[in-house]
């Protein structure tokens, strides 16, 4: 199967973008995302984003996100800026775009060359909106959470997808590959959760690292950055109504909390490359002589091995 793609990144949060507006999303999209996202062995990315025909009147397109493990996400802040940039450079040259997501319709405004502002919608701290269980019914702001026998103070935010935000003294000192999975798969979050670890520089400047469900540590996460600023506002650390600049491993995003808990994100979107991939369907592996070996039940396979002279002297068989 021949597949045309565009690789794009926002703050180094990179995805493979497929134009699915006419043909629709490939049936094997989950397996395809796993295969093509493998770094060093394939194109390499945080997942695949499909640009689809809109489902809402007045929308310009719909975005569907598939993580590197094949699971489907609901919203991606960095990804939606790249979708807007892709549409703008592929004939939809509007200064304001409307894009469908599984978290609702989002409005994106062009603010310069490759620079986009996204109205992300309102956030919620209620456990039912995450969802979160065994944490009561009150807003999840500065609550204790035991993770691998360690007690953390967390603020949980839904910004179209679920996030768990915690303040740490030094984000660079964290061993995210160890603690990230423990947060992601915590029993209190039945649909898993994204986790942001944030270091406060001052009231309008933060440093952040993120562990994304389904992808592991990524160099940036737009929704995670929004959740982080929302959490810091809830804690009284960052001011509402002002731009807060968040430094991630892949770059900087600017977030503002507006009245009604609405969030606005501004950041860049860039095309890395375009290309065509030849994706092979899985088949039985052929031998050099050109025929395939059919799979055998275990018992038959052992019986055939026993007939080979060089195997009969080996202690392989038991009773």
PLM region spans:
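Short, acidic, Ser/Thr-enriched surface-loop or helix-capping motifs
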Residues: 67-68, 157, 296
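A glycine-rich beta-to-alpha transition motif near the start of alpha/beta enzyme domains, typified by
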Residues: 1-114, 164-279
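Membrane helix-loop-helix hairpins that form the core translocation module of multi-pass transporters
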Residues: 113-117, 121-123
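Short hydrophobic alpha-helical segments enriched in small aliphatic residues
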Residues: 290-292
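Active-site glycine-rich loop that binds ribose-phosphate moieties when present
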Residues: 124-153
């Amino acid at each position: 199967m021949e597949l045309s793609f565009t690789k794009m990144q926002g703050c180094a949060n990179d995805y493979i973008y497929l134009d699915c507006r006419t043909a629709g999303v490939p049936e094997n999209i989950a397996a395809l995302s796993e295969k093509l996202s493998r770094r060093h062995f394939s194109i390499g990315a945080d997942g695949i984003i499909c640009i689809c025909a809109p489902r809402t009147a007045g929308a310009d397109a719909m975005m569907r996100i598939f993580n590197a493990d094949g699971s489907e996400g609901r919203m991606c802040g960095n990804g939606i800026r790249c979708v807007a940039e892709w549409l703008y450079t592929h004939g939809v040259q509007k200064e304001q775009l409307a894009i469908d997501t599984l978290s609702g319709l989002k409005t994106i405004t062009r603010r310069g060359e490759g620079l986009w502002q996204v109205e992300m919608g309102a956030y919620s701290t209620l456990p039912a909106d995450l969802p979160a269980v065994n944490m009561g019914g009150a807003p999840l702001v500065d609550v204790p959470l035991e993770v691998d026998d360690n007690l953390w103070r967390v603020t949980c935010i839904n910004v179209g997808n679920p996030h768990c935000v915690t303040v740490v003294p030094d984000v660079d000192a964290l061993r995210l590959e160890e603690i990230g999975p423990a947060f992601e798969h915590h029993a209190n979050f039945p649909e898993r959760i994204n986790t942001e670890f944030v270091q406060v520089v001052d009231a309008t400047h933060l440093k952040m690292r993120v562990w994304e469900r389904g992808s592991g540590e990524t160099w940036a996460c737009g929704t995670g950055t929004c959740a982080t600023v929302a959490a810091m506002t809830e804690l009284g650390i960052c001011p509402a109504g002002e731009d807060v600049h968040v430094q991630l491993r892949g770059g900087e995003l600017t977030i503002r909390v507006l009245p009604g808990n609405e969030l606005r994100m501004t950041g860049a979107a860039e095309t890395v490359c375009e290309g065509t991939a030849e994706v092979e369907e899985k088949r039985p592996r052929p031998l050099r002589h050109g025929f395939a070996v059919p799979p055998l039940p275990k018992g038959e396979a052992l019986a055939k091995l026993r007939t080979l002279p060089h195997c009969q002297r080996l202690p392989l068989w038991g009773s």
